[in-house]
């Protein structure tokens, strides 16, 4: 029998999911994206060559792996085609390997215009979105007025729906935000061009996944962003617009929870966050700058500098519960090399002095102070280590303490950006 393995982020995104998905797809027949859009940025390094993916699943660089985009993903046709062409220029036969659900909501120019106009209007109170139209596209979906990829192949029906949508959204853009209107004919013509390009890649992804499952094939489910950015379970309102936690798999792919065999939670050996929102362990000192520089902490999608802080066991415990995590993958351990002491956040202290667990909304984080447990660092290099025994004793103790604090095993340790710089203690597909 095949196994269905999930890879998802347990922090605020940017945990290193792309590398791990790429590593594990050696065993998979298919990789499926089930939520988010091209706001994701998954970086792969193979033999020193770097590839950044936004919409296309991270298995695309492996021959014989089918890459699927499930119905829960919002698709910007222009961004998708740019990504396809860029990979094809490197010799990757993307159109042979990629199939897309016609039920995916479309991100069009008016979604991008709305997203950017809102962030501009919020000023200092902005959420910190990527400005790529993700939120407005999900809003249209939930309001049951959105256009889907499948609509592209019925020109008259598409044109009628597009006209109604532009009447609605242009009214807001022009009258409320004082921004220019989106042109109907230009948008329609562009969409019809994309229709021709996308049609050969259409597939009932849900049916395909169940066919693969019944045939005993291994399937990888690739999450985007991180658990603390989940629309329901994250630090609301500083969240994304989809369910980044395990619940999003069933709704975004059509594969129910009973069929999921192993859920791998990816966590950095420290913590980062992009954009606005609470971050209890954030560092504003030289160590924060050290982590950012050593870890190359700049967003793969936006290029924005990431905020850096100590490892937070509190948010990880919440993520483990919410996702039913089977095991963890600890990434970027090598970034901590050379630090004399390392702190782990074990709780939050409120203004009354009581130690509490993770709050459920952003406002409740105000006034909380992290409670730290200090551990010795290590001077030796962990970069490229392939076995646990190669790691310094202090690094092994750090890993063991994290396991104790969060109540989940660390099954994989990443010791560098390349797919081969990895220690696998328990393989998810085993």
Curated annotation (Swiss-Prot):
Stretch forming the signal peptide: none
One example of a Gene Ontology biological process annotation: IMP metabolic process
- Keyword Cytoplasm listed? The answer is yes
| Residues binding substrate, per UniProt | 300-306
What intrachain disulfides are recorded?
A: none
What does the record give as the active site?
A: 14 (proton acceptor), 42 (proton donor)
The prosthetic group or cofactor this protein requires is: Mg(2+)
Q: What is its EC number?
A: 6.3.4.4
Entry keyword annotation includes Metal-binding: yes
Location in the cell reads: Cytoplasm
Entry-linked Gene3D superfamilies: Adenylosuccinate Synthetase, subunit A, domain 1, Adenylosuccinate Synthetase, subunit A, domain 2, Adenylosuccinate Synthetase, subunit A, domain 3
Q: Which residues bind GTP?
A: 13-19, 41-43, 306, 332-334, 414-416
Q: Which enzyme type, at the first EC level?
A: ligase
The record's keywords, sorted A to Z, are:
Cytoplasm, GTP-binding, Ligase, Magnesium, Metal-binding, Nucleotide-binding, Purine biosynthesis
Give the reaction(s) catalysed.
IMP + L-aspartate + GTP = N(6)-(1,2-dicarboxyethyl)-AMP + GDP + phosphate + 2 H(+)
Query: What is the top-level taxon of the source organism?
Result: Bacteria
Q: Which family does it belong to?
A: Belongs to the adenylosuccinate synthetase family.
Instruction: Outline what the protein does.
Output: Plays an important role in the de novo pathway of purine nucleotide biosynthesis. Catalyzes the first committed step in the biosynthesis of AMP from IMP.
Task: Indicate what this protein is called per its UniProt record.
Answer: Adenylosuccinate synthetase
Which species does the entry assign this protein to? Pseudomonas fluorescens (strain ATCC BAA-477 / NRRL B-23932 / Pf-5)
């Amino acid at each position: 029998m095949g196994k269905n393995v999930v890879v998802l982020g347990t922090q605020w995104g940017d945990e290193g999911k792309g590398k791990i998905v790429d590593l594990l797809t050696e065993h998979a027949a298919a990789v499926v994206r089930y939520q988010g859009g091209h706001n994701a940025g998954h970086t792969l390094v193979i033999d020193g060559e770097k590839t950044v993916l936004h919409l296309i699943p991270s298995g695309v660089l492996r021959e014989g792996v089918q890459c699927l985009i499930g119905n829960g993903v919002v698709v910007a046709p222009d961004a998708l085609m740019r990504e396809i062409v860029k990979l094809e220029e490197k010799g990757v036969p993307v159109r042979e390997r990629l199939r897309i659900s016609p039920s995916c909501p479309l991100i069009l120019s008016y979604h991008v215009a709305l997203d950017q106009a809102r962030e501009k209007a919020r000023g200092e109170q902005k959420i910190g979105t990527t400005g790529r139209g993700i939120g407005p596209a999900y809003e249209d979906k939930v309001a049951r007025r959105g256009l889907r990829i499948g609509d592209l192949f019925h020109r008259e029906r598409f044109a009628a729906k597009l006209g109604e949508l532009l009447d609605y959204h242009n009214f807001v853009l022009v009258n409320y935000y004082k921004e220019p209107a989106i042109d109907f004919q230009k948008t329609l013509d562009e969409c019809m061009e994309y229709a021709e390009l996308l049609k050969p890649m259409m597939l009932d992804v849900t049916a395909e996944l169940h066919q693969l499952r019944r045939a005993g094939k291994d399937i990888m489910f690739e999450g985007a962003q991180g658990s603390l950015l989940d629309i329901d379970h994250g630090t609301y309102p500083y969240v994304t617009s989809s369910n980044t936690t395990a619940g999003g798999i069933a709704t975004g792919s059509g594969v129910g929870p009973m069929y999921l065999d192993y859920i791998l939670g990816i966590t950095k050996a420290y913590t980062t966050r992009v954009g606005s929102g609470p971050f209890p362990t954030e560092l504003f000192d030289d160590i924060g700058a050290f982590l950012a520089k050593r870890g190359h902490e700049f967003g793969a999608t936006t290029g924005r500098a990431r905020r850096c802080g100590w490892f937070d066991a509190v948010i990880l415990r919440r993520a483990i519960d919410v996702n039913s995590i089977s095991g963890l993958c600890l990434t970027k351990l090598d970034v901590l090399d050379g630090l004399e002491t390392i702190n782990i956040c074990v709780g939050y202290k409120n203004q009354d002095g009581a130690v509490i667990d993770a709050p459920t909304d952003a406002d409740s984080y105000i006034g909380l102070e992290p409670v730290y447990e200090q551990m010795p660092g290590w001077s030796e290099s962990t970069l490229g280590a392939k076995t646990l025994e190669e790691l310094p004793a202090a690094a092994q103790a750090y890993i063991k303490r994290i396991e104790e604090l969060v109540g989940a095993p660390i099954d994989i340790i990443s010791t560098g950006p390349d797919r081969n710089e990895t220690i696998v203690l328990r393989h998810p597909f085993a």
